[in-house]
Amino acid sequence: MSIFIGQLIGFAVIVFILVKWVVPPIKGLMQKQQEAVRVALAESAEAGKKLADADAMHAKAVEDAKAAGAKVTEEAQQDSQRITAQLAEQADAEAERIKAQGAQQVQLMRQQLIRQLRSGLGSESVQKAEEIVRNYVSDPAAQASTVDRFLDELDAMAPSSAVLEAGASLNLRAASREALAELVKKFESVAESADTAALATLADNLSAVARLLLTSATLDKHLAEPTGDSAAKVRLLERLFGGKVDDNTMDLLKTAVAQRWSTEGNLIDAVEHVARLALLVRAEREGQSEEVEDQLFRFGRVLDAQSQLSRLLADPVIPADKRVALLKKVLDSGGGVNPIAEALLTQTVELIRGASADDAVNDLAELAVARRGEAVAQVTAAADLSDAQRTRLTEVLSRIYGTPVSIQLEVDPEVLGGLLITVGDEVIDGSISSRLAAARTGLPD
């Protein structure tokens, strides 16, 4: 019994110990475990809820993605259709451009080919025509017939309105023209009573005075300046030239300084002009006018053909005496020249200023012809004209210009046929060579 009680007490003590110290921790552990299970269950429930929400959101996202994908697909299809249409339009436009450009290129190539064919054919035609013409005009009778045909055409021309002038008055203003007219009038009265020797002296003296005025600008200014009282200028002339020049020269100089000149240089022009007239009147008195005119025109053509000689004779840097020496050398090399023509050319070279030598000599030649009341026609032909052709040409030109015309003929075989006529500033070109040249010029490039 005692054992049983002892065991019971021991059991009770064990129970007490268990209840006191073992059960509470175990109970606490169990509560904690339960709480942990509860929390785990709550978390599980929350996780399940979140999972459900996530599934819902996923489903929604999928739907949204499908909708967006459908929209993008639709827009892409629309863009692709639009791009396709644009590319098609661009392709059509580019095709049209290439087509038009190709057509234009074809047209340009066609035109170029046509031009080349025309140019080649035209050149060959002109060349063949030139050969035919040259063969034709190789016969003197045929060549003469081309001149006759041109004279027929010239005969039908209306009267020309050309105004033909010559001499120093060409570039003078009104006051100087009037002054020159008075001086020439005085010269005519002096020349009536002068013999050829007096005219030669007069020409030499006037030429010397012109050279002096040309080198002394101050003297020229005093003698040419306009003034109401010319007595002072006359006294100056007498002091300078008294006893050094003849009376005729002094009278002409007094008349010259008494006039009103537009510019100072016109006085020199007038004195030179009268010096030329003195020599031309001398040529008339001695019956050498035509010879002088012909030699002047011939020398003018020489200067036209030799530009370097023309430049040297007019070069102001070269002293006048050296230019005159060159002139005499050229004249002597040509077999000599009429003394009056030589004197006229010497005057011109000594006093040349501001003009080319060929122009100055041509003006001198025209003055020589104009002295006889004629105009000068410079005619270029392929061969010499017959007397009948020359006479007819003179008559036709005289009728056209309303004044007697003097013919100066130059033979140039390159003219081929017809005539090239220059009267003053007017040119009548009826040469075959110019017509062939015009045909070449008219060919397409």
From Swiss-Prot:
Q: Which Gene3D superfamilies match?
A: N-terminal domain of the delta subunit of the F1F0-ATP synthase (1.10.520.20)
Matching CDD domains: ATP-synt_Fo_b
Q: Where is this region: ATP synthase subunit b?
A: 1-168
Protein name as catalogued:
ATP synthase subunit b-delta
User: What GO MF annotations does this protein's record show?
Assistant: proton-transporting ATP synthase activity, rotational mechanism
Question: What species is this protein from?
Answer: Mycolicibacterium vanbaalenii (strain DSM 7251 / JCM 13017 / BCRC 16820 / KCTC 9966 / NRRL B-24157 / PYR-1) (Mycobacterium vanbaalenii)
Q: Does the keyword Transmembrane helix apply?
A: yes
Q: Where is the signal peptide?
A: none
Q: Which family does it belong to?
A: In the N-terminal section; belongs to the ATPase B chain family. In the C-terminal section; belongs to the ATPase delta chain family.
Q: What is its main location?
A: membrane
